[in-house]
């Protein structure tokens, strides 16, 4: 473990891939070239995390083909129309029994509970270790245990605890991903247009989900084991690319900013948008170099309400992530049931909507300078979208896809905004006094708390859908979306008050972010 600890920046070696590119070029890479490499490598890295994570939701119907269709038409109709060969084989023990849906829900919650638990420690370690190596180890470990879950197919393994342990270990290694990629991107990009840049970059979540869905659905015809092994191999390969090319920070590779930001364009009232993470040269005191503690990070104004909001936002988002293909395949659309592969492909519309929603939320929050108003508005608007999808999604494929797209846009928009731009804002809060070692910890706290909700949602869905109906599940999701918006009420009020103050020419303008942060000290 000691070998992973960061030494002085100037003593760290450049990644081998960077040295190779510079040898080919014959000179040092420009700062903008490094930024492009960071965006591409971290985008691919986290997309591969989500591709591996998405597999379970696609394979659910193959493992548990005899699950109750929760109040719709009988299973006989389902198996006589569009039933896949995998379904006809009777599923896979122990998931094809009467409690199969519950067992799959327990697998999901085990993965997400360990993921959430590991997230808190991942952020703490990420602020103290070489992020390139830390991220690489996480990706290789994720690929290994994702693949071992699939090996159960060829090994004829039917032990529930084998699959449970593989998912838990995969979740532990997956927790290394998000704090690491956000911290690295934060090292290279300043606050200007952060919401838009990170909104576009955050498309890796939906791109990974879409890719994982398509790969897993395509592999089902060859055996469900391949649906796990192929994404597992992909994330290992990308992990090696990450090790070879990822520059953790400008100081690590000796890069110098090749453009000077106009201070007048960076200033908002009396507030100046400083770089997302200050370099070590900007923080000369030991206090500024000290990594922020867990409790200290929780006390940063705004962290608690946004973290709790994300708890409910991810509860909704991850219920769709893990159960949407299963729900679609168990719902008669135009009177017919879809195959597992078709249902998996159709479910990608939720993630396509998520890409659009993430970009929209980032752009809107940049334009109006109000993160909380944007996030809360999206969450409130998602409530009628959820209602209409449940009520009219069965009418036709077009209606299902359109409403799924709209729901994904409204649910994933605030999720993307909070986990990227908001986390970066709070990780550089003025109360930190320039401390550059807080972003991974703050990101881990916010996303870790959200991941607890991500574990609760799929678990409740498994129990509710097997004992009640999908209408009850959607009622739960609408309630969660309402609470998510409600938790931001105080921040929204502060932002609205700031906007009113800004509209008065006699009053001195202040940064909306600073105003909100000053008025949530007690939250």
From Swiss-Prot:
Keyword hit for Transport: yes
Biological process, per Gene Ontology: phosphate ion homeostasis
Main location class: membrane
Domain of life of the source: Eukaryota
Conditions for induction: By inorganic phosphate (Pi) starvation.
An MF annotation (GO) of this entry: transmembrane transporter activity
Compartment(s): Membrane
Keywords: Membrane, Sugar transport, Transmembrane, Transmembrane helix, Transport
Transmembrane residue ranges: 29-49, 102-122, 133-153, 163-183, 196-216, 228-248, 306-326, 344-364, 368-388, 402-422, 444-464, 468-488
Coiled-coil boundaries: none
Example of a GO cellular component annotation carried by this entry: membrane
Membrane topology designation: Multi-pass membrane protein
Family recorded in the similarity comment: Belongs to the major facilitator superfamily. Organophosphate:Pi antiporter (OPA) (TC 2.A.1.4) family.
Designated name of the protein: Putative glycerol-3-phosphate transporter 1
């Amino acid at each position: 473990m000691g070998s992973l600890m960061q030494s002085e920046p100037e003593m760290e070696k450049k990644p081998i891939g960077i040295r190779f590119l510079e040898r080919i070029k014959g000179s040092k890479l420009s700062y903008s070239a490094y930024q492009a490499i960071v965006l591409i490598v971290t985008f691919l890295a986290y997309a591969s995390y989500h591709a591996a994570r998405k597999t379970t939701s696609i394979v659910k119907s193959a493992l548990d083909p005899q699950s109750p269709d929760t109040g719709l038409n009988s299973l006989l109709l389902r198996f006589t129309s569009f039933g896949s060969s995998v379904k006809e084989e009777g599923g896979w023990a122990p998931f094809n029994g009467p409690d199969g849906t519950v067992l799959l829900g327990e697998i999901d919650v085990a993965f997400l509970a360990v993921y959430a638990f590991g997230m808190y420690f991942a952020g703490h370690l990420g602020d103290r270790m070489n992020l390139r190596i830390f991220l690489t180890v996480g990706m290789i470990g994720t690929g290994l245990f994702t693949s071992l879950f699939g090996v159960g197919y060829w090994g004829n393994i039917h032990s529930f605890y084998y699959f449970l342990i593989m998912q838990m270990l995969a979740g532990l290694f997956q927790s290394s991903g998000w704090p690491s990629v956000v911290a690295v991107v934060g090292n290279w990009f300043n606050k200007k247009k952060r919401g838009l840049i990170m909104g576009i970059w955050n498309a890796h979540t939906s791109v990974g989900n879409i890719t994982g869905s398509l790969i897993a659905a395509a592999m089902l015809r060859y055996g469900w084991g391949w649906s796990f092994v192929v994404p597992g191999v992909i994330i290992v390969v990308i992990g090696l690319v990450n090790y070879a090319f990822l520059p953790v920070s400008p100081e690590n590779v000796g890069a110098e900013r090749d453009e000077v930001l106009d201070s007048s364009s960076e200033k908002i009232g009396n507030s100046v948008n400083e770089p997302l993470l200050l370099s070590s040269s900007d923080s000369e005191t030991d206090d500024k170099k000290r990594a922020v503690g867990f409790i200290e990070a929780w006390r940063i104004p705004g962290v608690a309400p946004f973290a709790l909001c994300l708890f409910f936002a991810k509860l909704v988002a991850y219920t769709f992530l893990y159960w949407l293909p299963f729900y679609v395949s168990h719902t008669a659309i135009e009177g017919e049931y879809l195959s597992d592969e078709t249902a998996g492909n159709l479910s990608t519309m939720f993630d396509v909507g998520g890409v659009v929603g993430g970009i929209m939320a980032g752009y809107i929050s940049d334009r109006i300078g109000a993160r909380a108003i944007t996030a809360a508005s999206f969450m409130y608007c998602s409530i009628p979208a959820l209602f209409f999808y449940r009520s009219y999604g069965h009418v036709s494929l077009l209606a299902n896809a359109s409403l799924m797209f709209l729901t994904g846009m409204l649910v994933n928009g605030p999720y993307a905004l909070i986990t990227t731009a908001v986390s970066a804002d709070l990780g550089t809060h003025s109360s930190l006094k320039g401390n550059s070692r807080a972003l991974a910890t703050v990101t881990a706290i916010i996303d870790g708390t959200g991941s607890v909700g991500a574990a609760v949602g799929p678990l409740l869905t498994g129990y509710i859908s097997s004992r009640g109906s999908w209408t009850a599940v959607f009622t739960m999701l609408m309630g969660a979306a309402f609470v998510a918006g409600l938790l931001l009420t105080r921040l929204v009020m502060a932002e609205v008050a700031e906007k009113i103050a800004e509209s008065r020419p006699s009053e001195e303008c202040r940064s909306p972010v600073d105003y909100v942060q000053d008025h949530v000290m007690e939250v």
